[in-house]
């Protein structure tokens, strides 16, 4: 998110960035994955050639860039990243803090898109936001690599101050039970079509530049008022939420 990053500069050394996959001119009003943009994953090959694969620890990506405005990966994009990472022995990490636990109609967006990463980070939905909790899922090979030391040694040298917090764990287990018992992931898939139809009904309204429904999420771009970026969105929030 450029406007966020420019306030703080580069926080982590040795990090390269792939091109943003969103192009309104080519993707506007797409439902689900846009058709255009899979080729942008090939930029990873240039980065590998520049630095050598042995110096690249991992590729980290959100299957759906949420905070930037609900920007789903183009069709075939994640598959290309997976293939390039496999070709060069690079780990692929999915940040599913937002997309995990039903928002995309599945436990994880990785399942929806049929692409298996080496690691998944998650939070938020694991407790339905009731109590802060997060975690990481890893492939068995990665797990085994950390478990080769003696039993008395710390398996993953990391901060443990709040690990396995009893309240957070109880909230997480209860939430997962509800997801399973009430079939909420399947229900999200069932409602997805209605959600997209309702969102796209706003297309003809003035100042609507783009609508991007995917799963039970949607991003809507509104034309800015002159000299007041964000004001139109705030007014829409006030009128649509606080007044109703």
Please place each PLM-identified region on the residue numbering:
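Conserved N-terminal phosphate-binding loop of PLP-dependent enzymes in the Aspartate aminotransferase
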Residues: 1-244
